[in-house]
Amino acid sequence: MAELFLATNSDFREVTDFINMVFDKNFPEFMEKVYTEENFMRAEHYCIRDEGRLAACVAVYPQTIRCGDESIECAWIGSVSVSPDKRGMGYMKQLMAHVNQVLVDRGIPFAYLSGRRNRYGFYGYEITGMRNYFTFEEENIRLTIGFDACNEYEFDPLYQEDKEDLESVMKLYEKRLFMVRTAEDMVPGMKTWEYRPYVVKKKGEFQGYILIKGDEIAEIELVNFENVLNVCGAVMLCFGIENLKIEARTWEIEKCRILAEKCERYHIETLGNMKIFDFKKTLGYFMETERKIRNIKPGKLIVEVTGEDTFSIEVTEKTVKTDIIDSEKADISVTPSQLIRLCFTRGGDFITGFDS
């Protein structure tokens, strides 16, 4: 008989071996922040054991997002795996339903995950988020500042033991709208997905940091971001890269502006999948974040979410107020999926699926 259980530290080796097998990866290297014996309990692994061995697993990683002084708790869903010989038996449906209920019971307002849109749409997740990619080619450097202007920069690997560099990196990182990383887990967190952190220095002086894998920089923070073209040229020289791609999130307005002015080309992609459990709290937090980052005009919108509630979202010059109401006619009526696309993808009417 199949048994659903929450893994404990004693299950570390069995769970890790299982997901290594399903994904054909070495998770202790791929995701050091969780898949070591000392870090394993940072995540919750909900598993099904059938006939004495693991058949399926879903991991829940608690996360905190912070913008300035405001933060919100959420969850990242990962390591979604089923043994090849146990597929089609409904174990993933059982685990995902269980995890969703656990998060609802805890009051977690939303969860997100990476993966196939239509696979996870079955469980109520919708494609969400935007990220911008800016591509720099050798000609961008050669025809502007020249590579000689890049020779003074160097890149030192960042280790957890490098207290002085780590402190400088943390100060830059904490200026972002970001997933909270503590000083203790900063480097293991940065190394997730096989990225590698480097400190950027010029004549021995700290200039910032990059998070790089192959020809892609997933994070870049500089003391003076106007020097990004010099740093790009130095990265190309140091790492032997001809075409360098830099990722920046939509809310990083000034960073995107500078990168767009200096790069060869750019494109936009969606980010992942999201499921909202508490619409009031989620909308309230991200609308307030949007107000702080952008110049949103004061106003009020009544939104009816099919199968949920009707919400009043009121923006003033100083705050955003989100309430559940039942006395006013809605300005728009949307499904939960349409709401996520409307609020988090910036794709226009043809993406949101309704006429604004």
Go through each PLM region and give its residues:
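Short amphipathic alpha-helix that is part of the acyltransferase structural core
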Residues: 1-62, 69-76, 142-184, 215-216
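Conserved GNAT acetyl-CoA-binding A-motif
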Residues: 96, 101-115, 239-250
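A glycine-centered beta-loop-beta connector
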Residues: 49-53, 201-205, 355-356
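Conserved acetyl-CoA pyrophosphate-binding loop and the N-cap/start of the following alpha-helix
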Residues: 86-98, 108, 226-234
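Active-site/acyl-donor-binding loops of N-acyltransferases
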Residues: 118, 126-144, 226, 233-354
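Conserved acetyl-CoA binding element of GNAT-fold acetyltransferases
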Residues: 72-84, 215-225
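Amide-forming acyltransferase catalytic core, primarily the GNAT-like/NAT-type
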Residues: 131-240, 280-297
